[in-house]
């Protein structure tokens, strides 16, 4: 029921976007270029065909770019594909399908868990025999297809750790992954999407260019935002569900998440411990409608 309700609300916001966008053009509000970032976890062999079907639909309806895309001469929908946790199933089942279609992706690696089953609570149902890719597999990934990003060392809730421990998770995961692969790792995703303002500041100091949460906020790549939101996707999503997600129809959930946190834990919200990315100030009308434009 909860899933169906999300689909219904997303349909409403997606349809509302048409007249709002038209009205914005009439009154002279510039339509900003948007990026929708999808994120997956594991891709078991049993659902590989469904993942491939989603990639076909994505190619038909959007231009696929890297998760670090800063904007450019692209018309229509723009999407990026990311994977958290660097599971072997992603390398075995997702990457061959992406390679066939020449679709780039970003994989976020928990460097302290290489070659082992996940020792953390999973956000989605995953194949029980899946493990994190080992060092040799990570090093073998083609840089023309895969951009690597850090996902800390041990996949903790960063905002709950002592500050120095959190700093070590952030800094060491970047330096170790860079040394292992020979790449200058500049991207990181937060485990569980958990961060606060201090954690975000640590990431900047550690040398990351962009970091990623799990709230489906609208990403405006030309605005120079440091924290980018993403929308969770599964090969089990229905065609309508996947279309709405890749089209940015789930952006309203960032508002719902912010309101829920403010109501349930006002002190935590005011202290800045939240998943929703912080953006530069905007006018009230523009802020409310920005996800529709």
Regions found by a protein language model. Give the residues of each.
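C-terminal active-site subregion of NodB/CE4 polysaccharide deacetylases
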Residues: 2-82, 88-89, 93, 160-293
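Acidic (Asp/Glu)-rich catalytic clusters
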Residues: 54-63, 96-103, 130-150
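Acidic/aromatic-lined carbohydrate-recognition and catalytic surfaces
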Residues: 83-88, 94-97, 101, 110, ...
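Generic enzyme active-site microenvironment
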Residues: 82-83, 149
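A short acidic, helix-capping loop that chelates divalent metal ions and anchors anionic groups
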Residues: 116-119, 156-161
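Histidine-centered catalytic micro-motifs
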Residues: 38, 43, 147-156
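Alpha-helix N-cap and loop-to-helix initiation/capping positions
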Residues: 125-129, 133, 161-168
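A short, conserved beta-to-alpha structural element at the edge of catalytic cores
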Residues: 102-124
């Amino acid at each position: 029921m909860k899933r169906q309700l999300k689909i219904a609300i997303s349909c409403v916001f997606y349809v509302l976007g048409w007249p709002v966008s038209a009205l914005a053009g009439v009154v002279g509000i510039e339509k900003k270029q948007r990026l929708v970032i999808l994120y997956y976890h594991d891709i078991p062999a049993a659902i590989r065909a469904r993942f491939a079907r989603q990639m076909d639909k994505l190619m038909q309806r959007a231009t696929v770019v890297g998760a670090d895309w800063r904007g450019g001469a692209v018309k229509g929908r723009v999407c990026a594909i990311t994977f958290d946790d660097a599971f072997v199933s992603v390398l075995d089942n997702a990457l061959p399908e992406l390679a066939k279609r020449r679709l780039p992706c970003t994989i976020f690696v928990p460097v302290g868990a290489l070659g082992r089953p996940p020792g953390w609570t999973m956000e989605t149902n995953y194949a029980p025999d899946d493990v994190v890719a080992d060092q040799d597999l990570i090093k073998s990934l083609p840089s023309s297809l895969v951009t690597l990003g850090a996902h800390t060392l041990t996949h903790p809730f960063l905002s709950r750790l002592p500050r120095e421990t959190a700093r070590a998770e952030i800094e060491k995961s970047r330096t170790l992954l860079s040394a292992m692969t020979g790449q200058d790792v500049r991207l990181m995703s937060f485990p569980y999407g958990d961060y606060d303002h201090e954690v975000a500041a640590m990431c900047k100091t550690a040398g990351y260019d962009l970091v990623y949460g799990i709230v489906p906020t609208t990403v405006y790549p030309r605005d120079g935002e440091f924290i980018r939101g993403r929308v969770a996707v599964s090969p089990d999503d229905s065609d309508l569900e996947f279309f709405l997600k890749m089209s940015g129809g789930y952006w309203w959930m960032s508002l719902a998440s912010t309101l829920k946190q403010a109501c349930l834990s006002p002190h935590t919200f005011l202290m800045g411990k939240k998943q929703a990315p912080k953006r530069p100030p905007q006018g009230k009308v523009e802020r409310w409608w920005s996800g529709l434009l």
